[in-house]
Amino acid sequence: MKKSAIILSKIILILTLLLSFGMSWNNVFSNTKNSIVSREISPSLAPMLEKVMPSVISINIEGSAITRTSRLPHQFQPFFGDNSPFCQGNSPFRHSPFCHINPDSDDKKEKFRALGSGVIINADKGYAVTNNHVVENANKIQVQLSDGRRYEARVIGKDSRSDIALIQLKNANNLSEIKIADSDNLRVGDYTVAIGNPYGLGETVTSGIISALGRSGLNIEHYENFIQTDAAINRGNSGGALVNLKGELIGINTAILAPDGGNIGIGFAIPCNMVKNLTAQMVQFGQVRRGELGIMGMELNSDLAQIMKINSQKGAFVSRVLPNSSAFEAGIKAGDIIISLNRKPISSFSSLRAEIGSLPVATKMELGVFREGRIKNITVELKHSVKHNLNSENDYIGIEGVDLSDYIFNEQKVIKVDNVKPHTPASKIGFKKDDIILNVNQKLISNVDELKKFLHSKPKILVFNIKRGNDTIYLVSE
C-alpha cells in the first residue's frame, strides 16, 4: 500500500514537472513569436533612409554681397536725387545740383558664410540640385557627403525666378544619386520625409504628410506651384530632399512659413517635375531659356465663373493676349478660360504660369480652352519671351538689371525699358522705367534680340541714345 502511494506520488510529481516545463516552453515560444511579429509590424524609415541619405549633401558657402548704407539721414533722402518731387517734370530745380546727388553710399562688399542642403541627381556627372538662394553670391562652394567625404563644387546654372540651382561636384566618384518620382501623381495626405542640414547640425530627418498641392500667392518666388508639407523644414534645410516612403524625390525644400523664425508645421517644396525640366535646360544651356505663352490673366473666382457661365472655379482666365505672342498666333483670345495643359487639369492661373514657366522654347503643347460654352483644344508652340530680362550671367554685365521689350515709337521699331532694378549696373548707368532706346553707339537697334547680340560682342564703351519724355539724352557705360 505504501509502495503504491509512493509510486503514485512520483508519477504525479513527474507529470507536474512536465506540465510546468511545457507551459514555460510555450511561454518562451510565445514571447519569441510575439517579439518577431512585433518587429515585423513595427514601422521604421531606417531601411529607406539607408538608401537615400548618401544622395543628400550638406553645402557650405563662402561668398560676398553688396550692401549699401545711406549718406544722408533717412528723413532727408526723399528730397535728393532723381526721385525727389522737386526734380520731376518741368520743375525749375530739375537741373540743380541737389537733383544729381545720390542719397545712397557707394557699394560695399561684405563677406558671409552660409549653410544649405542639396540632392545628387546624376552620380556619373556629379550633378546636384539645390536652391538658388543657397549658392547666390557664392565665391566658394564645398559639399560634404553622408560618409564624410568633402568636395569643391561649381555652379552649372541657376534660376532666381524658380529658386533652383544646379551645381557639379569636382573630381567626385562613387556617388549615389536619388531616384526621382513623378510629382504629378502626388495626393494630399501622402506621407513625406524631409532630409537636410538644419542649423549646420548635419543630416537630419523629419516626417509628415502633404498638406496641400499647387500652393501659390506666397510672394516667395516668381513661379509658385509649391507642395505644402507639415514635415519640419528649418534653416539649412533649403535645397534638401522631400521624399516619399519609397525614398523617391518628390520635391526640393525651399521655404517655411515662420513668423518668429521657427517651424510651425507649414513648409514648402518645389515639385520634382519642375526641377527636372529646369535642370535639363541648365545642363544644356547653362541657364533656363523659358518659352512664354504671352497672356495676362487672373484666378477664376465664383463671381467671374458666374459671369462667364462656367460651373467651376478651376481654370486660368485670360484677360489679355499679347501681340505676336505664342498665344496670339495659336488663336487664344481674351475671355478664354484655360482648363487643361496636355490633358492635365489646370486649377488656377498661378498653376498654369508655373507649369509653362519650366518649359523651354519650342515646346509644343495642347491647351484645353473653354470658350462660349464649349471646350476647344488648341495646339501652341512656345516662343521666346515677348519681354526679355537681360539680368543673366551670360549677358553683358554693363546692362544687368533691366527689363526690355520690343516697341513701336513714331512708326519706328525701338526698345522700351519696362523696369529697372535698384542697385544694379543698369540703374547706375541711369536707365529709368519707360525710357525708349533709339540707338546704341549710333547704330539703329530695332529689337531686343539685336541688342543682345550687340552686347555679346562686348564693345569697349556703350552710348545709349534715349528718349525720355520730351527730352533726348545719352547714357554712357564704360
Curated annotation (Swiss-Prot):
Signal sequence, start to end: 1-26
Renumbered residue ranges of the record's region Serine protease: 116-254
Xref: SUPFAM superfamilies: PDZ domain-like, Trypsin-like serine proteases
Disulfide bridge positions per record: 87-99
InterPro entries for the chain: PDZ, PDZ_sf, Pept_S1C_Do, Peptidase_S1_PA, Peptidase_S1C
GO-annotated molecular function: serine-type endopeptidase activity
GO biological process: proteolysis
The keyword Signal is annotated on this UniProt entry: yes
Keyword annotations of the record: Disulfide bond, Hydrolase, Protease, Repeat, Serine protease, Signal
Recorded superkingdom: Bacteria
Annotated active site: 133 (charge relay system), 163 (charge relay system), 238 (charge relay system)
E.C. numbers: 3.4.21.-
Gene3D superfamilies from the UniProt entry: 2.30.42.10, 2.40.10.120
Domain PDZ, residue spans: 281-372, 387-469
Family statement drawn from the similarity comment of this UniProt entry: Belongs to the peptidase S1C family.
Name of the protein: Probable serine protease do-like
